[in-house]
């Protein structure tokens, strides 16, 4: 995000996004892609400022599309997960369903080697940008959980934990309830998860 775009985001943080979207002609200096990104950043901040009270105050923090903002963990939830995981004797952590990266970010405060895995290009780029602002030691992998597992962790290291929070929606967007219908398929991956790590959650 350029400094000019960042300034515009800050200037309009409290504006009505729907009204701002109708004022495209006021910003001829912005490409259509930049204008959409401007709206996305303002909308994301407004939707997550209560859920992410600390992160939302960081200059140049970036926000993904609406659904990802709605589905991400709150800071409180991510900190609680991190506290629980920090009590395990591990030094390597891999989040195979990285998403917006909030869980990964807080867990990385307790573990020296952290892998964030996300197949969505835009989410991955935003997470990488945000990690660089807070915890640059997080290793980012723009790939699927399956592909990452194929190449990572040759054996079940005693100090490795693999974490997954699969999408509970089908490719068509409808809700699913069985583990084998989630994406990625935990049931199918479970033998590999057990082979490659001491802990799975």
What are the language-model segments listed below?
Residues 1-201:
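SAM-dependent transferase fold signal centered on methyltransferase-like domains
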């Amino acid at each position: 995000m350029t400094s000019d775009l960042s300034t515009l985001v800050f200037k309009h943080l409290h504006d009505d996004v729907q009204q701002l979207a109708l004022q495209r002609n006021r910003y001829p200096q912005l490409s259509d892609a930049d204008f959409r990104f401007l709206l996305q950043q303002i909308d994301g901040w407004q939707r997550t400022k209560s859920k992410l009270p600390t992160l939302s105050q960081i200059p140049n923090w970036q926000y993904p599309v609406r659904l990802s903002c709605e589905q991400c963990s709150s800071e409180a939830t991510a900190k609680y997960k991190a506290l629980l995981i920090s009590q395990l004797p591990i030094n390597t952590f891999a989040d195979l369903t990285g998403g917006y990266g909030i869980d990964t970010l807080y867990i990385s405060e307790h573990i020296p080697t952290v892998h964030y895995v996300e197949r969505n290009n835009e989410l991955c780029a935003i997470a990488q940008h945000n990690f660089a602002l807070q915890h640059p030691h997080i290793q980012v992998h723009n790939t699927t959980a399956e592909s990452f597992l194929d190449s990572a962790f040759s054996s079940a290291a005693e100090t490795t934990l693999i974490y997954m929070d699969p999408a509970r929606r089908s490719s068509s967007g409808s809700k699913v309830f069985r583990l084998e219908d989630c994406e990625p398929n935990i049931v199918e991956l479970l033998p590999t998860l057990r082979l490659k790590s001491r802990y799975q959650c």
